[in-house]
Amino acid sequence: MSSPDGGYASDDQNQGKCSVPIMMTGLGQCQWAEPMTSLGEGKLKSDAGSANSRSKAEARIRRPMNAFMVWAKDERKRLAQQNPDLHNAELSKMLGKSWKSLTLAEKRPFVEEAERLRVQHMQDHPNYKYRPRRRKQVKRMKRAENGFMHMAEAQESAVLGADGRMCLENFSLGYHEQTYPHGQVPQSSHYREPQAVAPHYDGYSLPTPESSPLDLAEADPVFFTSPAQDECQMMPYSYNGSYPHQQNSMLVRQMPQTEQMGQVSPVQGMMACQSSPHMYYGQMYLPGSARHHQLHQAGQPSPPPEAQQMGRADHIQPADMLAEVDRTEFEQYLSYVAKSDLGMHYHAQESVVPTADNGPISSVLSDASTAVYYCNYPSA
């Protein structure tokens, strides 16, 4: 860049300052004499560089002006004087609209002037060839890429945590495992409770389960303790509540009435032991009303069925169960279902029906277990 004074004032200043040591010989040489000479050399170099750039600019041949450029040369100056606060881009837009609004008669003198300049340019530069300058698209593309990268980083920082990792540790809901000593029965509140989710995940919508976790308790062995699995008397989770009448009537019919009146505790033990296969197969083949009730209650978490099971067992007395016994219906379950519907041979109890007169209690139990096993298979 050329200095505003043209380089002349800097030379005069250097001469005046350098003459100070000559006039004041007693004080010695000035401290700033050497730096000023270096600054003067830098200014001379910058002046030489600006002169070279001017020569290069003058060496490049400009294109001849067209009609619009000839008209806008004076019109731009006039608009700039009228609107000094407007930007050059706004002035160019106004000039373009004004030029388009002109008629052909108004444009004719400027078109003729542009043609004269073109002919003059051809005469002055016969070997002229237009070489368009390369636009600096690389820098613009880099700027755009940097902008996109900043936007992407901002979005990633919004999704990721402060340490740059997805915070997925709290999504795995842990359960408190509890152990019970051998011989003790867990209480109704022994089922597991999930840990509370962190408060910053309240905005996420978690999927709603199709069924309650307690309804699938048979498939999960963690819901039972080892003594409860070994002993048949304790079954805290079952589907007995859906069809108590059918199961109780089938199991009570296995005992003769004379022995059932005297032995109440063996009947209860037999009911507890024989309900396991029925609970296993009854889950897949429930009656229509029970299945409808289960589907209706599937979306809601249900309390532990232990309290319901104990409540039903309290008000159901052995006398009420014995009143519902039907001998003929029980014989139908033993003989007819096993032979005709399922197509299986039933040789052991085919000729003798278990009664109170002809057979011990062991034969009755074997017949009942076989009937319950075959009745729960699907009739395919």
From Swiss-Prot:
What subcellular locations does the record give? Nucleus
According to UniProt, the tissues expressing it are described as:
In early gastrulae, expressed in the vegetal but not animal hemisphere. The vegetal region is fated to become endoderm, and endodermal expression continues throughout gastrulation and neurulation. At tailbud stages, expression is down-regulated and becomes restricted to the most posterior endoderm and the future liver/gall bladder region. By 3-7 days, endodermal expression is restricted to the gall bladder bud. Also expressed in the embryonic gut, with strong expression in the posterior gut during tailbud stages, but by stage 40, expression rises again in the anterior gut.
Q: Which UniProt keywords apply?
A: Activator, Developmental protein, DNA-binding, Gastrulation, Nucleus, Transcription, Transcription regulation, Wnt signaling pathway
- Segments of the chain annotated as binding DNA: 61-129
Q: Where is this region: Disordered?
A: 1-20, 40-59, 292-312
**Where are the stretches annotated Required for transcriptional activity and interaction with ctnnb1?**
329-334
- Residue ranges of every copy of the Sox C-terminal domain listed in the record: 264-379
Which superkingdom, per the lineage?
Eukaryota
Q: What is its main location?
A: nucleus
Q: Name one GO molecular function term.
A: RNA polymerase II cis-regulatory region sequence-specific DNA binding
The UniProt entry's GO biological process terms, in alphabetical order, are: angiogenesis; cell migration involved in gastrulation; endoderm development; endoderm formation; foregut morphogenesis; heart development; hindgut morphogenesis; midgut development
Q: One Pfam family this chain carries?
A: Sox17_18_mid
UniProt motif 9aaTAD: location: 328-336
**What are its GO cellular component terms?**
nucleus
- SMART domains named in the record: HMG (SM00398)
**InterPro entries named in the record:** HMG_box_dom, HMG_box_dom_sf, Sox7/17/18_central, Sox_C, SRY-related_HMG-box_TF-like
What does the induction field say?
Involved in multiple regulatory feedback loops with other endodermal factors, including the nodal-related factors/Xnrs. Autoinduces. Induced by activin. Induced directly by vegt; originally this is in a cell-autonomous fashion but subsequently cell contact is required for expression to be maintained.
Q: Mind telling me which CDD domains this protein's record contains?
A: HMG-box_SoxF_SOX17
Q: What is known of its domains?
A: The 9aaTAD motif is a transactivation domain present in a large number of yeast and animal transcription factors.
Function of this protein?
Transcriptional activator. Binds to the DNA sequence 5'-AACAAT-3'. All of the sox17 proteins are required for embryonic endoderm development and gastrulation movements, and show some redundancy in function. In addition, the sox17 proteins have distinct but overlapping roles in later gut development. Acts downstream of vegt-signaling in endoderm differentiation to induce a range of endodermal genes both directly (including endodermin and dhh/chh) and indirectly. Also represses wnt-responsive genes to inhibit wnt/beta-catenin signaling.
What quaternary arrangement does the UniProt entry report?
Interacts (via C-terminus) with ctnnb1/beta-catenin (via Armadillo repeats); this interaction is required for inhibition of wnt-signaling.
Record protein name field: Transcription factor Sox-17-alpha-A
Question: What is the gene name?
Answer: sox17a-a
